[in-house]
């Protein structure tokens, strides 16, 4: 999944 934190996007597998 992915989410946005502090203005950047992070993807998690």
From Swiss-Prot:
Locations listed in the record: Secreted
Designated name of the protein: Salmocidin-2A
Chief place where the protein resides: secreted
Source organism, top-level taxon: Eukaryota
Free-text function comment from the UniProt entry: Antibacterial activity against Gram-negative bacteria.
Gene Ontology CC terms, in alphabetical order: extracellular region
Alphabetical keyword list: Antibiotic, Antimicrobial, Secreted
Tissue specificity of this protein: Plasma serum.
GO BP field: defense response to bacterium
Keyword match Transferase: no
């Amino acid at each position: 999944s992915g989410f946005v934190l502090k203005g950047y996007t992070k993807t998690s597998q």
